[in-house]
Amino acid sequence: MALMSKAAIVTGAAQGIGKAIAARLVKDGMRVAIVDVNQEAAVAAAEELAGQYGADTMAVQCDVSQEEQVNIAVQKVLERFGTVDVLVNNAGILSLKKPFVEYTKADWDKIFGINFMGDVFFCKALIPTMKEKKSGRIINMASQSAETGGLAASPIYAASKAAVWCMTKSLAGEMGPYQVTVNAVAPGYIMTEMTRNAGYRDDMVPMKRLGTPEDVADVVGFLASEDSRYVTGMIVDINGGTVMR
């Protein structure tokens, strides 16, 4: 899976699944931009990966729900790396659990702004470059919640990930003629700092263990590679068997 000299953007990459994805890509020889709303954490992650793997990394602060910030972030990466071959839209947040009728429009706007519109903004910013090169990989972060509705009292999160799911398939058809693949991964119960208090248990999974960020990162590594050149429009389940289709 030679990715030497290629460059990637990974959003929400300062910790958890995003950081594991960034680590996988730098281990494969990629230059990686760590994009995160937390500047200090992004710098720390970029420096850690550079020191550990001798990688060419950079940290970019960005609130993915703000289109202007996304455009500025993409421009910074293009100025530094000269290209972006792989976009991993990983940034996301969970929704608070409460009765459906108690969710406000602000709640819906916040979750959709980060979990869905962030993907839209980064795709819009990078698609022209990828179309011109007739090459590229776009990998979005869906969730098994898009299929199951998620755990009780989390409708906004599930709906936002269902939107990512559908956009991925639609965009794959549009980008096919340009040799740009568009796929998504749909993690199940993955243990991260963000999900630590979500109530996940080993006995919820047929394989009797919770997933790790590396379980997700290794699949993303494949989708980012030349080995996946004829794979597009796919939602890849990473859930230990909790959802089978």
Feature roles, as predicted:
Residues 103, 149-158, 170:
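Active-site loop-to-helix junction immediately N-terminal to the catalytic Tyr of the SDR YXXXK motif
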Residues 123, 160, 168:
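Active-site helix of classical SDR
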Residues 2, 94-97, 148, 221, ...:
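Short C-terminal tail/terminal secondary-structure segment
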Residues 83, 176, 181, 231-233, ...:
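Short, small/polar-rich loop/turn modules that mediate ligand/substrate recognition or access, typified
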Residues 98-100, 107-112, 201-202:
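Substrate-binding pocket helix/loop in short-chain dehydrogenase/reductase
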